[in-house]
Design a protein with these regions (language model features):
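Glycine-rich phosphate-binding "P-loop"
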Residues: 13-25, 177-184
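A general structural motif
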Residues: 2, 43, 66, 130, ...
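Basic, amphipathic juxtamembrane/active-site segments
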Residues: 17-38, 228-230
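Active-site phosphate-binding/coordination module
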Residues: 27-124
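Asp-based phosphoryl-transfer active-site loop
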Residues: 3-22, 48, 220
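Charged, glycine/proline-rich intrinsically disordered loops and linkers
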Residues: 24, 85-105, 159-178, 237-241
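Conserved acidic, metal-coordinating active-site core of Asp-based
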Residues: 113-223
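Mg2+-dependent phosphoryl-transfer enzymes with acidic/Ser/Thr/Gly-rich catalytic loops
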Residues: 1-4, 28-29, 183-185, 190-269
Length: 269
């Protein structure tokens, strides 16, 4: 029996312009809303898992009538108003946020200097964040993690959160830019999802997840089925590299793919 759907926002539930009511091409659609309605009628919880700031995800969760959500790439989890920070040893203290502590470590400067012309802050969405440093460009995140480790910053990692539209400020990239989050190594969407499942008493077989990035695919390890929306593969074919057997690619893009995943999972429950 399906009891919970974990879904990413941008590039998954949301369409062009980050709208619930626009598809990948910008046309009006009700399919994502209908999928949410189907979940409501079937008593299935929907949990948003996003790289967005807490304030943004909180409002999005309220808009769809849900009381649990995951923010800043799994760095934080809120269940029925109770917040849990999942950032390991990096915790807010003495008036400083985790974002401040990461800044003081020198890690953001190291990455931006090393990958100058290939990596920059994701302006303006990098502002007013409490945990992750938000960047865009095109780098090998595994290589970046090794660089951090070599400089004594192995408690952090650079997370690839999927491809975005080209940016004029990065004209020399060899492919479409990606969004990256510099976060504590212990944090992940998969860990946050697993913690929510334990809190609610859900088994993996009772849960599915939907997403469009490599970090989203990591959630496949803790749920019964994972649906990768078609636009993820279109933008970044490498996202399919080494995926587990329970990952399926939808025919639809963005919210159409979310609808497809929900309807399929409900029909087979």
């Amino acid at each position: 029996m399906l009891r919970c759907v974990y879904t990413d926002l941008d590039g998954t539930l949301l369409g062009r312009g980050a709208s619930l009511f626009r598809d990948a091409d910008g046309l009006f659609t009700l399919l994502p809303a209908r999928a949410l309605e189907a979940c409501f009628r079937a008593n299935v919880e929907v949990v948003l898992k996003s790289g967005r700031r807490k304030a943004q995800v909180m409002e999005d969760a309220r808009l769809i009538g849900q009381t649990a959500y995951i923010f800043e790439m799994g760095c934080g989890l809120v269940i029925d108003g109770e917040e849990t920070m999942l950032t390991g040893d990096l915790q807010p203290a003495n008036g400083k946020t985790v974002h401040d502590l990461i800044e003081e470590s020198g890690a953001p400067k190291l990455l931006l200097d090393t990958y100058a012309g290939r990596l920059e802050y994701h302006d303006p969405w990098h502002l007013n964040r409490e945990i992750s440093h938000l960047m865009r460009g095109l780098v090998d995140s595994d290589e970046a993690d090794r660089l951090l480790e070599e400089h004594g910053l192995g408690n952090l990692r650079l997370v690839d959160n999927g491809a975005i539209a080209p940016k004029g400020s990065l004209p020399d990239l060899e492919g479409p830019p990606h969004v990256y989050h510099l976060i504590p190594r212990q944090a992940s969407k998969a860990d946050a999802v697993a913690r929510h499942m334990r809190a609610r008493g859900y088994s993996p077989e009772e849960c599915i997840a939907v997403g469009d990035s490599r970090e989203d695919v990591g959630v496949a390890a803790v749920v019964g089925r994972f649906f990768l929306v078609a636009n993820a593969v279109e933008k970044d074919p490498d996202v399919m590299r080494g995926v587990p057997a329970n990952v399926e690619v939808t025919e639809g893009r963005n919210g159409d793919g979310f609808y497809e995943a929900v309807v399929k999972a409900l029909a087979e429950r």
